[in-house]
């Protein structure tokens, strides 16, 4: 009887230890999964949302805009001559420039807006609170102003410029997030061709 009691207590202790290990494993897996999801949706250099997450934000903004007078504006921003900066001054300087551009863009937009790094030297800003194309242009000018001040490089101050394309969601066109981003990208290339 005592032997049976000891075995029962041992079995209970073993079961509790196994359950505790399972709970710890589940928590670890949840944390790992959260990390994987976060890494899949953000840019590792800047911590900004990436293209996938930005497209989700744009799609939500488009869907929400049908109920209000506010329309999403997408700005496609390309850092001018970034390849030559990267090639001549090195990748660490290029990374520092991209990080500073990300910081300045984040500071230049309203709290309701979102900035993402979608590739190399390309950024996208979404502002879902604009009520006219004129407000979109004002936002683009504010962003250009934020980038005008020199940035620190490993040879002194560097002046960085950018080309910006703007796309404003017109309700009657029923554009998708991908369409809106593509229109902004096309407008950016036109701006770049026109002389930065």
Q: Which residues fall in each region the model found?
A:
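Amphipathic HAMP/coiled-coil signal-transducing linker helices
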Residues: 31-49, 63
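Short, well-ordered beta-strand segments
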Residues: 75, 124, 165-167
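Conserved long alpha-helical elements within nucleotide-processing catalytic cores of c-di-GMP signaling
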Residues: 47-73, 80-110, 116-125, 131-141, ...
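PAS/GAF-family sensory domains
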Residues: 29-32, 36, 54, 76, ...
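Cyclic nucleotide signaling catalytic output domains
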Residues: 115, 142, 156, 163-172, ...
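Interfacial "cap-and-anchor" motif at the non-cytosolic start of specific transmembrane alpha-helices
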Residues: 1-34
């Amino acid at each position: 009887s005592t032997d049976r009691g000891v075995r029962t207590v041992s079995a209970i202790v073993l079961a509790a230890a196994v359950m505790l290990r399972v709970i710890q494993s589940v928590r670890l897996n949840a944390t790992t999964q959260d990390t994987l999801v976060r890494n899949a949706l953000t840019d590792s250099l800047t911590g900004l949302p990436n293209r996938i997450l930005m497209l989700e934000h744009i799609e939500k903004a488009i869907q929400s805009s049908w109920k209000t007078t506010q329309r999403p504006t997408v700005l496609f921003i390309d850092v001018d001559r970034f390849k030559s900066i990267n090639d001549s001054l090195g990748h660490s300087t290029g990374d520092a420039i991209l990080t500073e551009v990300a910081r300045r863009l984040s500071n230049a937009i309203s709290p309701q807006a979102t900035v993402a790094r979608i590739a190399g030297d390309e950024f996208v800003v979404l502002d879902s609170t604009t009520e006219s194309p004129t407000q979109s242009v004002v936002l683009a000018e504010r962003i250009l102003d934020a980038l005008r001040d020199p940035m620190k490089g490993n040879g002194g101050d560097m002046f960085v410029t950018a080309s910006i394309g703007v796309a404003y969601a017109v309700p009657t066109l029923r554009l998708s997030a991908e369409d809106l981003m593509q229109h902004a990208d096309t407008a950016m290339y036109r701006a770049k061709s026109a002389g930065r």
